[in-house]
């Protein structure tokens, strides 16, 4: 039996995308996307925010860097990927990111809606 590795998030950017270029010249953008889950209780409503790290490659990376800013609404579809590295203090680190394969700029931001 096969497996499926599919992720989709629709949320708002916590910061403008960061763009860098690999040693081979490939553009890579990193995004931090917030999604909110509404929690209703008897006396109030709160929101639980989850932050998602996303990496975009090539033309998608350049598009994101050129057109997105903090607060913008965006949808990203892709696959989950684990990254491992050693930080500057020698600590082993690991995180899960979404490697974006589809990018939809939804226009507007939280700031514009407020």
Cite the ranges covered by each PLM segment.
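Single-stranded nucleic acid-binding surfaces, predominantly the OB-fold ssDNA-binding core
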Residues: 1-114
